[in-house]
Amino acid sequence: MADKEATVYIVDVGRSMGECRNGRSVTDLEWAMQYVWDRITGTVATGRKTAMMGVIGLRTDETSNELEDDVHFSHIAVLSNLKQFLMPDIRKLEDELKPSKTDKGDAISAIILAIQMIITHCKKLKYRRKIVLVTNGQGRMSDEDLGEIVKKVKEDNIELVVMGIDFDDPEYGYKEEDKDPHKAENETLLRTLVEDCDGVYGTFEQAVAELDIPRVKSVRSVASFKGYLQLGNPEEYDSALRIPVERYYRTYPAKPPTASSFVLRSEPEAGQEEAESSEAAAATQKGSQSGDAGLTTVRTMRTYQVEDKSAPGGKIDIERDELAKGYEYGRTAVHISETDENITILDTFAGLELMGFIQTDQYQRYMHMSNTNIIIAQRANDKAALALSSFIHALFELECYAVARLVVKENKPPVIVLLAPSIEPEYECLLEVQLPFAEDVRTYRFPPLDKVITVSGKVVTQHRNLPSDDLLDVMGKYVNSMELVDADEDGDPVETFPIDDSYSPVLHRIDAAIRARAIHPDQPIPPPSERLTKFSHPREDLIEKSQKHLEKLIEIADVKKVPPKAKGRKRTRETEKPLSGLDVDALLHHEKRVKISPNNAIPEFKQTLAQAENIEAIKDATKQMMVIVEDQIKHSLGNANYDRVIEALGTMRDELVSYEEPASYNDFLGQLKDKLLQEKLGGDRQELWWLVRRNKLGLVTQRESDQSRVTDTEAKEVSLTKMKE
């Protein structure tokens, strides 16, 4: 369980915070709120009820706090007491944090008030307590009783953080020129207070610059297995090895937040209110707790139906309890009763049993099948730690890996895992990955890349499809020039692509977008951080460094640019010439097709359109396809020809849209529907029209083709018209 937290933010909203300084285009308050919103929304995103936050406004127009009778606490307002923040709290806070019309208000008194809030809320319970002061240091600050403040902060273990706008920070290397003497005194006062409290003092120059750095979520470790690492059967042999161990994730994919479905809540009618189920009530309550009273969660309802010709609609509803499980065997379902279902479950017992050992040079890395886990000795068990350490060192010295059978829980399927020793200063463990069974391995045979084997079995090493020695040499130089490892001042290799700086673009981009929309629902989402996109493209220095090798590679490999695929009207498009320059049609002596054969209708229809020189030829080919399609429908025994008809209609639709003749298809489809409606094509063909709708082969609309005169509404009306009333 995560630690309880209590954080109070003191935000300076004085009149001076509404000014723009030092060449910035935003006010001091807007600049400071970037940091405050980042911290608040980051806490809200966790959804933890134990993460409490409070907000105090400093130098406000009004006074609202429990010590407001004291003149020292005037112009200080408690905007939010310590509580779990939700979306409405963020929206409310955004409206209240605006520059005031006064510069009166004491930051030191605001710190005292924040201490009082934390003490009242946390009492003597275990909390991580924190006060964050955000100010530009322009107001009046009292230096009375600083010793008592420091004593109380240390006594209650409160972390004091002061973030100042344009504050001097020698450690970061920032110094404001022509600083106001009064502000310089306030900075010195706050720095002394923070240093005495062992807190954190910084300038917003550094804080805002570091906002682009994605924060990696700290995950509390939870054991996925607790049991024994054993060699041999300890129940039968006294010499069997048995070590208590625990298993934890070493790598596990971090997943971005998932979207949930919500609907606007509508007030139930009088008759429906009593019929509301407890599940719906719970969903409504959950929706209101989520922070928006206008939304409610969507309930999922699943029904099961079976065919019954005697029932209305041809189907009847059945309960889930009436269903039975079955396994597909060929095209038949084999039913296994619940009493016999135990035969499909393998009886296993939790444990990690060693099966054997393998030399490190004989193991192939592609055998990894899972995330990486670590195996450590049972916590607070010195005997187990000593035994496991001996086992790890033995594997390391013999350059071996161990192969083991792992069952995480009783009656869970067993997996085969590989155990590799990992020894670091003051830390030892076994790295564990899952290995495949025989059925998990995919073995494929591909032709070799360094030779060509002819039909007669002859091996050819010099071929136009094989790289030459010059090509291999140039490719090697090009690859080396793109190396991601640089050298430092001493010539030692330095990793250019450290894993600690390679953040997940999807995860952090979605998180940043959600937080931006939560704070500013009407403003556009800002672009992604450069830290997330810097690995989307090669580095400029590497591109420049490798350019000469790339040009040499293009020259030797004889790389040619493929001409782009022509776009536009198919019937006015020139025939694309192959790279060889040969006229394939002239070589094959293709004659222009006059009549389309029903046995090969689709290919011949495409070929006829490709050879068409005018619109009349396109319309003639369309008419021929109309006759063929209608004939297939008329002579279809049941739905035997329906698949062929649907394929033909889809081809006609796509081709005629490409040739900018959607009217021909729309006219044909209208005629086809009329004939189906009047049962002129072999009787009742309602199922065929349903297939036309399901495959989205309706009229071509203006949205799909500029040459069409059919609107979406008209197309929908034609598609949804019933075949029979």
Curated annotation (Swiss-Prot):
One of its GO terms (cellular component) is chromosome, telomeric region. It is an enzyme of class 3 (hydrolase). InterPro entries: Ku70/Ku80_beta-barrel_dom, Ku80, Ku_C_sf, Ku_N, Ku_PK_bind, SPOC-like_C_dom_sf, VWF_A, vWFA_dom_sf. Keywords: ATP-binding, Chromosome, DNA damage, DNA recombination, DNA repair, DNA-binding, Helicase, Hydrolase, Nucleotide-binding, Nucleus, Telomere. The keyword Lipid metabolism does not apply. GO terms for biological process: DNA recombination; double-strand break repair via nonhomologous end joining; telomere maintenance. GO terms for molecular function: ATP binding; ATP hydrolysis activity; damaged DNA binding; double-stranded DNA binding; helicase activity; telomeric DNA binding. It catalyses: ATP + H2O = ADP + phosphate + H(+). Residues 285-298 have a biased composition (Polar residues). It is found in: Nucleus; Chromosome, Telomere. Heterodimer of Ku70 and Ku80. Belongs to the ku80 family. This is ATP-dependent DNA helicase II subunit 2. It comes from Aspergillus oryzae (strain ATCC 42149 / RIB 40) (Yellow koji mold). The lineage of its organism: Eukaryota, Fungi, Dikarya, Ascomycota, Pezizomycotina. The gene is ku80.
